[in-house]
Swiss-Prot record:
Region (Disordered): 1170-1230, 1368-1401
Stretches with biased composition (Polar residues): 1392-1401
This protein's encoding gene: Ccdc141
Localization per Swiss-Prot or TrEMBL: Cytoplasm; Cytoplasm, Cytoskeleton, Microtubule organizing center, Centrosome
Principal location listed in the UniProt entry: cytoplasm
Chain segments annotated as coiled-coil in the UniProt record: 67-94, 865-892, 947-1000
Binding partners and assembly: Interacts with DISC1. Interacts preferentially with phosphorylated forms of myosin regulatory light chain (MRLC). Interacts (via the N-terminal region) with HDAC6; inhibits the deacetylase activity of HDAC6. Interacts with KIBRA (via the C-terminal region); retains AMPAR in the cytosol after internalization.
General function of this protein: Plays a critical role in cortical radial and GnRH neurons migration during brain development. Regulates cortical radial migration by negatively controlling the activity of histone deacetylase 6 (HDAC6) and promotes centrosome maturation. CAMDI is required for dilation formation of cortical neurons during radial migration. Plays a critical role in learning and memory performance through regulation of AMPA-selective glutamate receptors (AMPARs) cell surface expression in competition with KIBRA.
Keyword annotations of the record: Coiled coil, Cytoplasm, Cytoskeleton, Phosphoprotein, Ubl conjugation
Record's protein name: Coiled-coil domain-containing protein 141
Outcome, altering T91E: Not resistant to CDC20-dependent degradation
Length: 1531
């Protein structure tokens, strides 16, 4: 309490004393206050507050108890107060002079005490009311819990009575809830009114009391709202359940009727599903009549169904049924039953009709089968041959099948359709069984054609088996014979090889027998006149020839090996005999004292061994000659190391000859020693006897040699071979005679030394030696002639074996072979055979010439070589003729090989062409299947690259075709006319197809290029529409903040400066779009294709016209002072412009700008993470906020300087009015694959640079230099990903997002409206800028073909163009940020929404899983730059968010910071290094679920040094110069 107004103005108030009263936790302090002469009581302190009611009933009761105690203690002081007042009265009576003062003191103290007691009484009443309120609330909550428990407990009912009692319980609970709710509301209202009244009573109202009243009211309202929310929700559930129960009761009667109808339909359906279709034609007709009766009865039940359906429809339309689904299901069930019944009726009618057709066809089949059975009996009695009978049986078999096929097919069809229930088709099965049994019985009697076919198949199988066996045998033998023959180094090894070849010879003979068997079977098949075996003789002929060749080769090798093995064995035996005789003649020295019988026995034994040795030695010699002859007759390279083998054999023969001569000398010496001890007379007698005997033998030999002298060398090989065999048999005797002559000569020398009378025998011995020497010379000549003659006849006979079978083949035309490999094999075999024949011819001629030369010697004058000379001449002529024929045949085969090779190469080219064409068609088809959204610019460019690849493949194919054509054109003259024509036609056909396909590819590529250019132009148009729309919106917004006519005038001029040059350029683009569309899709379709662009252009022009009109009207209204109305009009226009901005562009960009929008979305999302504080404003704007408030200086404009009043309007230089934007695909655009990156990143960078400019931040030049990135950095950034720039700039001010409806579509769509804003720099002369724009326009007006050429330029040129585009950007771009007041106005509703959601979360019955309202997006930054990764997550309870990097939990340290503000979570890295790159995951989790968002951080090197200052005039001059040069070069 305070004192009343005192007459003393300057009096002070003091506290005389104070009294504190405690009771439990309650406490009050009463102060006695004195002001001058006035004294009053005042409640200085109260704990708790007088209006504090507590938070629960227990707390309120405790407060009431403490207050009762406090009040009781205060009552105890009342007597002292009244005693003090009485004392004051006494003092006043005693001091009359100051009675007035004491009266006043008494009055104020009394009033204060009464007031204090009254307040405490009122608080006690307040606490009592509060206790009653909490009690009512508790009862209300208990009732709510009971009702909730009632709802949560499942209720089951089996009858309508139980359902009605349950409905009564619902009504009672609802009524009690309403009563408790009204009672609680009354109590709360009573308590609130009491608090308000208590707060406003008397003069005791102070701030503490007001605060206590507000706190208590808030508690009451919160508890009341919580309970009322539960009550309302519970009441809704009660009403809903009651309504459902009443609807269930309403449906019971309908269900009963529905069950009755359904039961009849179900029974009828079961009958229809189980009834048979009949077992005969009469039975089936009876069932058809019953079915017609059922149709009549079904119509009555259909009417009952329609009645129920109408009732159900009325129930559904009249009320909102809780059991609507049940009713619908029952109704649907009834409909399904009716439909099923109708379907079954229709099916049964159709099946009965089909069964009727089946039984009719079955009766006809039985009639035909009866006739066939009678005819079969007739055929059996006639005794026809197998082929004739087979033909008859086949005809009858066909007739059986044809006659029963219809009935059986109808039966199978009917059974397959009625397969769900086999009982219905039992009669059909039985009838089909009867028919099938009858057919099987008759088919068993018609088996002649099957037997005939089986026999034919057996023959064919046998032939195939034999031929397969022959081919396999040839395949096994051919690789063995392909190797060179190695006769080995020892007889055992040679014998093993010989056995192997003998086995091969046996195998060849067996194969030949199999081939003969196949030929016999083929002959048997030909007797059956089977046309399909016509091609087999050619194959058999080829196999016979191949087998014959292999047989000759095996025979030749076997003979060589046999001769070699026999030679080696014979030489070894001869060597053993030689060594044995040598040892005998060296060791067995005859002694004189030995018995003559012993010496004679030894001599005879040695003589026998000597004779055997001679035979074996000459046999070995003959085998060696035969082996050499075989080697000479063998093919070239047939034997491995031929010269070495011949040398080995010559060494063996030379060694054996020398050994024979040595042994002969040893034998003579042994004989001389043997007779040395005999008397001279005896030796002489023995000499004379031996001389006479030897002379007789020599004369006999002379007579034997006489027939040889008369020999005709032109005889047959047989006679010559017999003569040579006899000659070989005589060689041991001749050798023995030679040895005898030598022995006689030695004995002559020995006897002459002993003084024997030799004169009488000297002449005889001389004649003997002379005759023997002549005979030996003649024998050697005859032996050589005979050997060569035999060899000549052997070679001649071998030639006959080789040439005769080939004569017909050489004269005939070569067979048409399938592949070049077969032709190559046959050509190689022919060349090999010709070389062998030429070798044999040359060998025969050489032998013949040698024989004739030998015969012409004087010693051989009696030998006739006339016939041999004739044979030699004939052989030479035959050799020339055959060689010519063989060469001609090889030439034909070579031509065939060239033809096959050329044909195969052309076939390969055709296959390559087919493969290219198939893949190209697949490429076209896959591209045509893509929808319009997938067929974006990037996909189109990739398609063009693929088409270019196929064009290169076609050119490579053309080069291969040219090579093949050049190679085959020279050989066309050697081909037969038909083959040359075939190759020529095939080549021409391939060339034509390739030309046609090349034209298709070229046309398709041209179409794709035009489509690409069309999409580029459309993107340019859409880009201009977006910028123009955004500019119109910004100008409209800025105009609402302008307060002077001059500011609006400047704004209007700046807008006209932007829009005037760009509209004609946009109209040119639109015309180009129309022309391209008409060229691609035709006149009408092209016009429809361009309608959207034209319509949107008209809308933009209308908005521009409306804006200009609004600005003019605004200037007039500002002159008249009508600002409020003007602002409202502009706000309406501004809203319309925003609708225009967000409306038409969406549909246009779906098709043509989908990928660029995605790039912008990602770039904008990353920008949204960086540089934003909790109030949503960019950091740089907050840093300059103080400068903005203190500075009144505006930004200097290019033409005018604003006054103080004009500075109220945002500077027009901040409007960011761009000229015609550089599109991603224009001649001055970056490369095609960087559309997304440059569109998003450069647009964001240039747009953000405007936000760093403000009228209050300083001069223009400095701001321009700091805001624009360097050209090198810009060009490098264009090659990096689209998020590179986002880490260097702050988040753009989201003005357009707040004003457009994009905010309701999520952050992704909100960020798609960032644009490149370009205008003429303040320092650039307007003439230079206009000239640059004019040159750019001229470059875009080039022809379509030139634009297609420019589109294919290198990335280097496009990168330079990107640099020019960067230099043309004004640094003072961007939108003016809103004031803090407008920002508060925009944030306000969001705060209310958040509070509302918080209140809802208190009473929600279930949690909300985490949800990312902003996701992470991939970021690419330069090393050393700052970066922020930010997400925004919501959910209830509030989710906890954890950051992970590469799978490991991320924690804050000195390098990075993990930040959290409300629902936003972010990771901030001031300086990025390469180690920071990787996958980052933000995982949000609460009790309702877990959710994560991922992004990849890329770190690139920083190679571009910053440019601290730019000379804009120089940059613009460079830009214009490069543009002019580029335009001139591309003309």
């Amino acid at each position: 309490m305070s004192c009343k107004e005192s007459p003393h103005v300057g009096a002070s108030t003091t506290t005389v004393s104070s009294v504190a009263v405690h009771a439990g936790d309650s406490k009050i302090v009463i102060a006695v206050v004195k002001c001058g002469k006035w004294v009053r009581l005042q409640l200085a302190e109260s704990q708790p507050n007088l209006l504090e009611i507590g938070s629960s009933q227990d707390e309120t009761k405790k407060l009431l108890h403490d207050h009762e105690l406090l009040l009781a203690k205060l009552k105890a002081l009342e007597d002292r107060v009244w005693e003090l007042l009485r004392e004051a009265d006494r003092t006043a009576e005693a001091n009359k002079a100051q009675s007035q003062v004491y009266d006043a003191m008494a009055q104020t103290l009394g009033e204060a005490w009464a007031t204090l007691v009254s307040m405490l009484e009122r608080r006690r009443e307040l606490l009592g009311l509060t206790s009653e309120f909490f009690q009512s609330a508790l009862e209300f909550a208990i009732k709510i819990d009971q009702a909730e428990a009632f709802l949560q407990n499942p209720h089951e009912f089996e009858s309508t009575e139980a359902l009605q009692s349950l409905l009564l319980l619902h009504d009672r609970h609802a009524k009690e809830l309403l009563e408790r709710s009204l009672d609680l509301l009354n109590k709360s209202q009573q308590l609130t009114d009491f608090i308000e009244k208590f707060k406003c009573e008397g003069s005791t109202m102070n701030s503490e009391l007001i605060q206590g009243a507000q706190s208590s009211c808030l508690k009451i309202d919160s508890l009341l709202e919580l309970l009322q929310d539960r009550r309302r929700q519970l009441d809704k559930y009660l009403q809903q359940q009651r309504q459902e129960l009443s609807q269930v009761l309403q449906l019971c009667l309908w269900d009963q009727q529905e069950n009755q109808v359904s039961s009849w339909f179900q029974k009828a359906i079961r009958d229809l599903q189980e009834q048979s279709l009949g077992a005969s034609l009469s039975d089936n007709r009876e069932l058809i009549c019953k079915h017609e009766d059922l149709i009549v009865k079904a119509k009555e039940w259909d009417s009952a169904v329609e009645k129920l359906k109408s009732q159900a429809l009325g129930i559904l339309l009249s009320k909102d049924l809780a059991g609507k689904e049940h009713l619908q299901l029952s109704n649907q069930k009834l409909n399904r039953l009716q439909e099923e019944f109708g379907r079954l009726m229709v099916e049964r009618k159709a099946w009965l009709s089909m069964a009727n057709d089946f039984f009719t066809s079955a009766n006809k089949s039985f009639d035909v089968l009866g006739k066939v059975e009678a005819y079969l009996k007739l055929l059996k009695s006639e005794g026809l041959s197998l082929p004739v009978l087979a033909a008859k049986h086949e005809e009858l078999h066909r007739e059986i099948k044809d006659s029963t096929a219809t009935a059986l097919q109808k039966g199978r069809t009917l059974i397959s359709q009625v397969d769900s229930c086999r009982s219905r088709v039992t009669g059909i099965h039985e009838m089909m069984g009867y028919i099938q049994n009858r057919v099987d019985c008759l088919t068993e009697q018609c088996t002649a054609h099957e037997e005939f076919a089986r026999k034919r198949q057996q023959l064919a199988t046998s032939v195939d088996d034999y031929l397969r066996k022959v081919e396999m045998s040839i395949q096994e033998i051919r690789p063995i014979l392909a190797t060179t023959l190695d006769v080995a180094s020892s007889p055992s090894e040679s014998e093993k090889i010989l056995n192997k070849y003998l086995e091969l010879d046996i195998q060849v003979k067996e194969t030949a027998h199999a081939l003969e068997a196949a030929a016999k079977i083929m002959t048997e098949k030909n007797e059956l006149e089977l046309n399909e075996v016509a091609l087999l003789p050619l194959k058999v002929k080829w196999l016979e020839e191949e087998l014959s060749t292999l047989g000759r080769s095996i025979s030749c090798r076997s003979r060589i090996l046999q001769t070699y093995v026999a030679f080696r064995k014979s030489s070894e035996e001869a060597e053993e005999q030689l060594q044995s005789l040598k040892e005998f003649y060296l060791t067995e020295i005859p002694w004189k004292d030995e018995d003559d019988a012993v010496v004679k026995c030894q001599s005879n034994s040695a003589e026998r061994k000597w004779q055997l040795f001679l035979k074996k030695s000459f046999l070995t010699q003959d085998l060696s000659l035969e082996f050499l002859n075989l080697i000479n007759m063998a093919k070239e390279n047939e034997i491995l190391n031929v010269k070495n083998e011949m040398h080995i054999m010559e060494n063996i023969m030379e060694k054996q000859t020398n050994g024979r001569e040595e042994l002969s000398h040893l034998r003579v010496a042994w004989y001389l020693k043997a007779i040395e001890g005999k008397p001279a007379r005896e030796q002489w007698e023995m000499f004379k006897e031996k001389l006479t005997k030897t002379t007789h033998s020599v004369k006999l030999l002379h007579e034997v040699l006489m027939p040889v002298s008369a020999l005709d060398l032109g005889g047959s090989l047989q006679s010559t071979s017999d003569l040579r065999r006899r000659w070989i048999a005589m060689k041991p005797q001749l050798q023995q005679l030679h040895e005898d002559v030598q022995q006689i000569t030695k004995e002559w020398e020995v006897l002459s030394s002993q003084g024997a009378p030799l004169k009488e025998k000297a002449e005889q011995l001389k004649d003997l030696v002379h005759l023997h020497r002549r005979q030996r010379e003649r024998i050697q000549e005859y032996e050589e002639i005979l050997y060569k003659t035999v060899q000549f006849h052997q070679v001649k006979e071998e030639l006959v074996h080789l040439i005769k079978p080939r004569e017909l083949e050489l004269l005939a035309q070569p067979m048409e072979l399938a592949s070049s490999e077969e032709v190559q094999m046959q050509l190689g075999r022919s060349q090999e055979r010709r070389a062998h024949v030429d070798h044999l011819h040359q060998l025969a001629l050489t032998l013949g010439v040698d024989i004739i030369s030998s015969v012409q010697q004087p010693n051989c004058s009696n030998i006739s070589a006339k016939n041999l000379q004739q044979q030699l001449e004939a052989l030479e002529l035959e050799s020339r003729s055959w060689s010519a024929q063989a060469k001609e045949h090889e030439r034909v085969l070579s031509c065939s090989l060239e033809y096959c090779t050329a044909r195969d190469e052309i076939s390969e080219l055709k296959e390559s062409f087919k493969d290219i064409k198939k893949k190209f068609n697949n490429l076209k088809f896959n591209y045509s299947k893509k929808n319009e959204k997938s067929r974006n610019l990037k996909t189109l460019q990739y398609q063009i690259q693929q088409v270019d690849t196929y064009a290169e493949k076609i050119q490579a194919l053309r080069k291969k075709m040219e090579k093949v054509n050049n190679k085959t054109s020279d050989s066309f003259l050697s081909y037969p006319s038909n083959k040359a024509n075939m190759l020529s036609e095939a080549m021409e056909d391939l060339k034509k197809n390739v030309d046609d396909f090349d034209k298709v590819v070229t046309d398709y590529k041209m179409n794709l290029d035009l489509t690409e250019h069309l999409q580029e132009v459309i993107e340019e148009c859409n880009f201009w529409y977006e910028d123009a729309s955004a500019t119109v919106v910004r100008v409209g917004k800025y105009s609402m903040e302008c307060q002077t006519r001059e500011a609006v005038d400047i704004l209007h001029r700046q807008f006209n400066k932007f829009i005037t040059p760009s509209v004609p350029q946009q109209e040119e683009r639109i015309q180009e779009v129309i022309d391209l569309a008409q060229r691609l899709y035709g006149l009408e379709e092209g016009q429809k294709y361009a309608e959207k662009i034209v319509t949107r252009h008209k809308e933009i022009l209308e908005s521009i016209t409306e804006l200009c009109g609004s600005l003019v009207e605004l200037k007039e209204k500002l002159m008249q002072g009508e600002v409020p109305k003007m602002n409202s009009d502009l706000e309406d226009f501004h809203d319309n412009c925003i609708d225009l901005l967000k409306g038409p562009g969406k549909d246009d960009q779906k098709t043509f700008s989908e990928e660029r929008n995605e790039g912008q979305v990602q770039g904008a999302d990353v920008l949204a993470v960086n540089g934003t504080r909790e109030d949503g404003l960019p950091m740089d704007l907050r840093r300059t906020s103080s400068d903005k408030e203190d500075s009144a200086q505006g930004l200097i404009l290019p033409e005018d300087t604003l006054s103080g009043e004009e500075s109220e309007c945002i500077s027009s230089d901040d409007i960011s009015l761009p000229p015609l934007p550089v599109s991603p695909e224009s001649p001055l655009a970056p490369s095609d694959m960087e559309v997304e990156e440059l569109t998003s990143s450069s647009a964001l960078a240039l747009h953000i640079s405007g936000y760093r400019m403000h009228p209050g931040t300083g001069g223009l030049g400095k701001a321009q230099e700091s805001a624009l990135p360097s050209p090198i950095a810009f060009a490098d950034g264009g090659h990096s990903k689209k998020d590179t720039f986002t880490s260097h700039f702050e988040r753009p001010y989201p003005q357009l997002k707040a004003e457009s409806s994009l905010a309701s579509r999520g952050s992704a769509e909100m960020s798609t409206k960032l644009h490149i804003n370009v205008k003429c720099p303040a320092s650039m002369p307007h003439e230079v800028h206009d000239k640059a724009l004019q040159q750019c326009s001229q470059a875009r007006e080039s022809t379509l073909e030139m634009q297609e050429k420019v589109h294919a330029d290198s990335n280097v040129t496009k990168t330079q163009d990107r640099l020019h585009a960067a230099l043309d950007v004004s640094p003072g771009l961007g939108s003016q940020p809103d004031t803090s007041e407008s920002h508060q106005r925009r944030v306000g509703p969001q705060g209310n929404k958040k509070n509302s959601s918080a209140e809802n979360s208190v009473v929600s019955l279930a949690g909300q899983a985490p949800h990312f309202s902003r996701l992470l997006s991939n970021v690419t930054v330069m090393e050393g730059s700052p970066v922020t990764l930010e997400v925004e997550v919501t959910g209830f309870p509030e989710p906890t968010l954890t950051w992970f990097k590469k799978g490991q939990k991320l924690c804050a340290d000195g390098h990075l910071q993990v930040l959290h503000k409300d629902t936003k979570h972010s990771v901030f890295i001031p300086k990025v290094c390469e180690a920071d790159a990787g996958l980052y995951v933000a995982q949000a989790q609460n009790s309702s679920g877990t959710l994560s968002s991922k992004a990849i951080l890329h770190v690139t090197g920083n190679h571009g040094p910053p440019i601290t200052r730019l000379n804009w005039i120089m940059l613009c001059i460079i830009y214009v110069s490069v543009s002019v040069i580029y335009w001139l070069l591309t003309r």
